């Protein structure tokens, strides 16, 4: 019985640690990769929207449409998770009390808020303009957040 209690406790601790991993400042994650993930999720949402709009006739297609809707929703949620759990809670910080620092901080927050809103709109509709707006707002954030070296690294990931 003690052995099973030990195993259960060990598994509980391990899974808790794995789940909490993204909430600690470990330095494992890469900012540029998070941006690329958001771009990839957005393009998947766009693909889902296009499929949904063009395939709504018979039951077989309706089944596929349902699957694409679920796909679109999941990718939009992933974008919201990356923005809120990674950038907003861990990366975006007020550097100092200067006006320049405060202005940059507010601009970054606004850009990420717009990405969150666009992801929400992608969940609510199949209007592909929302994916365009999402990518535009993401690009605005990239320009505010990354220095020239970071932007170069992003381009190399394409």
What is the role of each PLM region?
Residues 16-20:
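Sec/Tat signal peptide C-region and signal peptidase I cleavage site
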Residues 21-60, 67:
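Immediate post-signal-peptide N-terminus of mature secreted/exported proteins
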Residues 63-70, 102, 106, 129-137:
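Short, charged, amphipathic alpha-helical segments
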Residues 82, 86-123:
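Long, amphipathic, charge-rich alpha-helical segments that form helical bundles/coiled-coils
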């Amino acid at each position: 019985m003690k052995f099973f209690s030990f195993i259960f406790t060990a598994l509980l601790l391990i899974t808790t640690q794995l789940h909490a991993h993204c909430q600690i400042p470990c330095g494992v994650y890469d900012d540029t990769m998070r941006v690329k993930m958001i771009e990839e999720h957005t393009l998947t949402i766009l693909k889902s929207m296009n499929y949904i709009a063009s395939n709504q006739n018979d039951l077989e297609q309706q089944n596929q449409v349902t699957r694409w809707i679920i796909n679109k929703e999941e990718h939009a949620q992933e974008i919201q998770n990356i923005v809120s759990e990674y950038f907003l809670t861990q990366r975006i910080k007020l550097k100092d009390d200067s006006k320049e620092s405060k202005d940059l901080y507010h601009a970054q927050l606004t850009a990420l808020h717009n990405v969150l809103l666009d992801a929400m709109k992608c969940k609510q509709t199949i209007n592909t303009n929302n994916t365009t707006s999402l990518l535009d707002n993401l690009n605005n954030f990239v320009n505010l957040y990354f220095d020239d070296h970071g932007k170069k690294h992003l381009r190399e990931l394409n």
